[in-house]
């Protein structure tokens, strides 16, 4: 064996040894990640047991390839169907801390806007790490997926889901965004009448579809508006969503035949609540909205 060949083999062996050492060190190193509240979370290893305290967070965990790590969810965590089989730990009004504790989670996922200070204080008494999430755009959905991939050690699945979400959103905007504008009223609730302003993800979907959110300029994320104001805005399309548990309620609009949407029969109930969920399913909901807006153009 020549000296040159021996040196080459020695270098290769050293390279592989160093690569293995680096990989082992990376696996053993603590995981440090900043959440959407600005707090840095440090964990010894990828999370194996997690409780989600918002339905969209459960969806994101599944989409990131870590559905098997979920040990507890909130009421209305219904997508994917496997989420319905998990223990319930509460709803939007109350969290059962005793149930949470018995599930022995390593991490709690909370929706920053969906939890009040009193609930935060009570959760802190459990002494568990808390990851606070806040999403205000489709980019935020993709970013959360990637961060969840790091939290759970499922980067390959999570990164692919994030990229797929970004590409689908880009394609939707390119396809529908430049079509003739349609005035849209999105009804979040019927009594009192509630809608979404420009800070809401639903507004972003309306704009991406080539629509105009007639109350986009209102203060508050989900402003309450009067029927007089809604009629005066004269939307060309009225949209809401519904499910078996919460049927769509659009019948009150029939009183106002002078509204363009009513006169044309453009009152649409989208199935499910995909547009209200800050998860990859939001893009599915946005596509259904775009199709409804497109039909109202004819």
Task: State where each predicted segment sits.
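N-terminal secretory signal peptides that target proteins for export/translocation
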Residues: 1-6
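Bacterial N-terminal signal peptides
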Residues: 11-23
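Boundary at the C-terminal end of the N-terminal hydrophobic targeting segment
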Residues: 23-30
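Extracytoplasmic substrate-binding proteins
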Residues: 31-33, 39-40, 106-107, 111, ...
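Short helix-initiation/N-cap motifs at beta->coil->alpha
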Residues: 34-38, 89-98, 114, 218-227
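A short, structured surface patch at a secondary-structure boundary
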Residues: 48-103, 107-113, 214
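Proline-aspartate-enriched helix->loop->beta-strand connector
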Residues: 94-113, 128, 226-243
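His/Asp/Glu-enriched short active-site or ligand-binding loop at hydrolase and phosphoryl-transfer sites
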Residues: 199-222, 268-269
């Amino acid at each position: 064996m020549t000296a040159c060949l021996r040196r080459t083999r020695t270098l290769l062996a050293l390279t592989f040894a160093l690569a293995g050492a680096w990989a082992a060190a990376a696996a053993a190193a603590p995981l440090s990640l900043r959440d959407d509240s600005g707090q840095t979370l440090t964990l010894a290893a990828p999370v194996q047991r997690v409780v989600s305290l918002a339905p969209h967070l459960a969806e994101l965990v599944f989409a990131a390839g870590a559905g098997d790590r979920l040990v507890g969810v909130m009421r209305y965590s219904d997508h994917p169907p496997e989420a319905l089989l998990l223990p319930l730990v509460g709803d939007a009004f109350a969290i059962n801390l005793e149930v949470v504790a018995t599930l022995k989670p390593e991490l709690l996922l909370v929706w920053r806007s969906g939890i009040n200070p009193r609930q935060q204080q009570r959760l802190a008494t459990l002494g568990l790490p808390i990851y606070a999430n806040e999403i205000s755009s489709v980019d935020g959905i993709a970013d959360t997926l990637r961060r969840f991939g790091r939290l759970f050690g499922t980067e390959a699945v999570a990164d692919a889901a994030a990229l797929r979400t970004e590409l689908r959103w880009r394609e939707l905007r390119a396809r529908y965004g430049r079509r003739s504008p349609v005035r849209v009223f999105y009804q979040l609730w019927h009594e009192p009448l509630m809608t979404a302003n420009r800070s809401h993800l639903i507004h972003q979907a309306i704009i991406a579809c080539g629509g105009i959110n007639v109350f986009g300029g209102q203060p508050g994320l989900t402003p309450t508006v009067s029927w007089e104001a809604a009629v005066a805005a004269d939307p060309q399309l009225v949209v809401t969503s519904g499910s078996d548990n919460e049927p769509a309620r659009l019948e009150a609009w029939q009183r106002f035949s002078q509204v363009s949407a009513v006169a044309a029969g453009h009152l649409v109930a989208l199935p499910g609540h995909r547009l209200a969920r800050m998860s990859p399913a939001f893009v599915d909901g946005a596509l259904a909205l775009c199709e409804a807006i497109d039909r109202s153009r004819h």
